[in-house]
Amino acid sequence: MSACAETGGVARVADTVRLRLRITGLVQGVGFRPEVARIAADHGVAGFVLNASGAVYCEFEGPGERVAAALARLRDAPPPLARIDAIDVETTAPQGDTTFAIRHSDDATTTSARTLVSPDIAICADCLRELFDPSDRRYLHPFITCTNCGPRYTVITDLPYDRPATTMADFAMCQACADEYADPADRRYHAQTIACPHCGPTLSWYGPGGGPPVAAAAAALSGGSIVAIKGIGGYHLACRADDDAAVATLRQRKSRPAKPFAVMTADIEGARRVAEVDAAAARSLRGPAAPIVLVPARAGTLSPLVAPGLRDVGVMVAYSPVHHLLFAALGPGALVMTSANQGGSPIVYRDGDLDWIDGLADAVLTHDRPIHVPCEDSVVAIDDDGAELPVRRSRGYAPLPVGLGGAAGNRPTVLAT
């Protein structure tokens, strides 16, 4: 067997060939295996793909030029959320395969290798459209997701990345979800967090008022209450960002007299109503990480207690289905969204800590999908060239490594503890 990194030699082979690929980088939790299966189908090659602890393994078998074309497409056009660091290629003996399969993950292969885990990804445009489409079976489903979006890092309990190794393990797929999961043409093909109203997690409301949980939370917020909301990486404390009394109460309860709060709006248009959002800031707000972005506040749109004495305010846009449903019920405006904790303490993320939250919030909007890894909202500033400057690197970026770039990119990786 000989290793190679190019496809030129393969393309000249007319007979059946088989290539064994080991692909490393950010290749788990980003729809990589389904995309490999689509590539194989499009190019008429057989074989398989599977997750292993340190990589994705794939074998392509077929006429040489078809195999070469499939490899070239995989390398040049991977899934948008993936990052390929290397593809190691070996030629191996053809096995006579006639189909291509996504195999069960192999946790016995390269168990000592390090695996890049995908960060949590903001809701994609397709899922957002379906969320508010009355004809869609996931209409208003607070946990809509697909291979292109949704929680990853915060729900993964083990590797390789498969549903049994996530906090979705206890939610058995209904037949409709199972059919989508098994359909190579579906956007949810092998989407590990797939769910729907029949088989997925559910919201719960603990507070005054009845009816649907989101509607009850919206009514409480509109009335000036402070509501704890379980999100992707932990609980937020939320209140109306234009309500001086609510913001003052929140500061008193959190023992946070002056440190600025971040605010959340439904979308970019809402962000521009409360802050000066230029094109670079908008790119960050709309990106898959959906961080808090520090931008100049617009006078008179927020309570002066949100960021007292400061020119800038931290703004983020709704990044989860629950957030979008909440803003749809609330209407235009902004919410303070701050971590549910006392000053200096870690974010609350375990449902067993709800009794402790009682001293901070008037009510709780929660759900039964466990959070395995807590994750705060990331914070970035924008420099004069429009590039992000990380202030706090967490949700949407963690646990990916930081690229040093330039000459530093050739230096050894160092883990500081």
Residue positions per predicted region:
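Intrinsically disordered, low-complexity, mixed-charge
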Residues: 1-193, 197-204
